[in-house]
Regions:
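Alpha/propeptide regions of enzymes that mature by internal proteolysis
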Residues: 1-297
Length: 297
């Protein structure tokens, strides 16, 4: 994911990372929360391909014109463990794969389902994957947009619009000894054009976990559930080269943030459901098979 179309290390974006449950590798998160910004594109992959993804991000950043003197890159890479369907120990993701993904990124509609980092993921016992959703506030509430992208790979009792669909389908975690695996993780990225600083982006990120809960996820012992939130507001970008003088920023007042919180909750919930609706049955490593959510049923 590209925070904007320019060089992110030269124009960093305000950001925050929230850990709903920390059993996952999210590189760069401590610096993001220390400095309050993100300085690279965001890459999602599988657990054992994190080093390759980091190398790809670093190579991409160093190769950009104007970055000849850059000697530190805080690469942001998130992951989930897709070892049931993917030959994860083979570490097939390469640095070139990451570079190709970055170079081919477009502002077009997100391809959802069993694609990219979602190719091998499993969600609520069904095929998971990449999902997205968005909300736009009315002009009376600022007219801001919230966009959410998820990599769904976790368990619980699938719930859609408040209905326990997993229970109805008799397929949910702990229903029998074969369906007791709720581990795997969920990566959630929340982007907004609202002028939020690190503190309010952290508050926004926390609300995304409520959206995960609304789908029936439980943030289990072995599930790493992280939220990366950032603002695209151009006037609040952090320039790499500064004159060390104070810079005026636009910050949305606390009292105006609640509509954004609701939007983040709704969009996260919907993005997770969309990842399931778009995914198709997948046969993977060693013939392991995961069925898609039976939509007609």
């Amino acid at each position: 994911m590209m925070p904007h179309t320019g060089d992110v290390v030269q124009q960093k974006v305000p950001a925050a990372v929230y850990s709903g449950h920390g059993f996952v590798n999210l590189t760069g998160s401590t610096q993001v929360n220390e400095l309050g910004n993100i300085e690279t594109p965001i890459v999602l992959t599988n657990t054992l391909s994190v080093p390759a993804a980091m190398n790809g991000l670093i190579s991409y950043t160093l190769a950009q014109a104007g970055n000849e003197k850059i000697s530190s890159v805080n690469a942001v890479v998130g992951e989930t463990n897709d070892g049931f369907l993917n030959d994860i120990r083979g570490r097939h993701v390469t640095e070139q794969n990451v570079l190709t993904a970055i170079q081919s990124a477009t502002p077009n509609k997100v391809i959802e389902g069993a694609v990219g980092a979602g190719t091998g993921t499993v969600c609520f016992g069904f095929k998971g994957g990449i999902g997205s959703s968005s909300r736009k506030l009315p002009a009376s509430l600022g007219g801001y947009t919230i966009g959410v992208l998820v990599q769904s790979n976790f368990g619980g009792v699938l719930t859609i619009n408040g209905i326990a669909v997993g229970a109805y389908l008799q397929k949910f975690s702990f229903s029998n000894e074969l369906l007791n695996n709720v581990d795997g993780s969920c990566m959630i990225i929340v982007a907004t054009d609202a002028p939020l600083d690190h503190r309010n982006l952290m508050r926004l990120a926390k609300r995304a976990m409520l959206g995960l809960g609304r789908t029936g996820g439980i943030a289990s012992n072995g599930s790493g559930d992280y939220v990366i939130a950032f603002s695209t507001a151009e006037q609040n970008r952090v320039l790499h080269q500064t004159n060390n003088l104070p810079k005026p920023l636009l910050n949305l007042p606390n009292d105006a943030t609640s509509p954004l919180f609701m939007a983040a909750i709704e969009a996260t919930e919907e993005a997770i459901i969309n990842s399931l609706l778009a995914a198709t049955e997948t046969i993977g490593f060693k013939g392991n098979k995961v069925a898609a959510l039976p939509i007609q049923q």
